[in-house]
A protein has these predicted regions:
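Surface-exposed loop/turn segments flanking beta-strands in extracellular/periplasmic regions
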Residues: 1-3, 51-70, 115-147
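Outer-membrane beta-barrel transmembrane strands
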Residues: 2-48, 74-95, 102, 114-116, ...
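Flexible domain-boundary/linker segments
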Residues: 38-40, 52, 107, 122
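Extracellular low-complexity Ser/Thr/Asn/Gly-rich intrinsically disordered segments
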Residues: 68-70, 76, 106
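Extended hydrophobic secondary-structure segments that form protein cores and membrane-embedded regions
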Residues: 102-108
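Glycine-rich, aromatic-flanked loop segments that form ligand/cofactor-binding clefts
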Residues: 109-113
């Protein structure tokens, strides 16, 4: 197998940005409010070339066998994903004598969205797709062999929380 044929057959661009910010406010001596926000965004795109690979096989006529369908091919995919979270917490803290109490209540939201689109084509009769990254797009090749797919979804959650801690001495 000429493994060099499979080398450098994918071009990819991947970008990602993420960050978070929070604010805190102490008020009325015993209260604290905190708000937190975070965002994570990713964008990925790939283009892949599939060459014709021939191998030595003594059991076939001519001693050379072709792996797969014997056609060159290209595929492309584009995916984006976004995750957003927000948290809001209110805390009351107080102590008197040998007693102390900390009470926390909160509200949290989470959102996740994914979109993926992909497609592929193989060569037509007499129209070999060249091993050239400038040609690795699904607009080349035999339109009758085109395949495509997609995935997309959105998910979200909302949560409420509460906790009370009491200490004596």
């Amino acid at each position: 197998v000429d493994v060099d044929l499979k080398a450098n057959t994918t071009k990819a661009e991947n970008y990602r940005g993420s960050g978070n910010v929070y604010g805190q406010w102490d008020f009325l001596k015993h209260f604290q409010f905190k708000a937190m926000f975070s965002l994570d965004y990713a964008s990925n795109s790939t283009r892949t070339y599939t060459p014709v690979i021939q191998v030595y096989d003594a059991s076939v006529e001519g001693d050379i066998a072709t792996l797969g369908n014997g056609k060159t091919g290209v595929s492309q995919a584009k995916e984006t994903e976004m995750k957003v979270q927000s948290d809001y917490l209110l805390t009351y803290t107080n102590s008197w004598g040998d007693h102390s109490v900390t009470a926390t209540a909160g509200f949290t939201t989470y959102y996740n969205k994914l979109e993926n689109l992909n497609g592929a084509r193989t060569q037509g009769v007499g129209l070999v797709i060249p091993d050239n990254p400038d040609k690795w797009y699904v607009s080349i090749g035999d339109a009758a062999t085109a395949t495509n797919g997609s995935t997309q979804w959105e998910r979200s959650t909302v949560s409420v929380l509460a906790r009370v801690l009491y200490n004596y001495k």
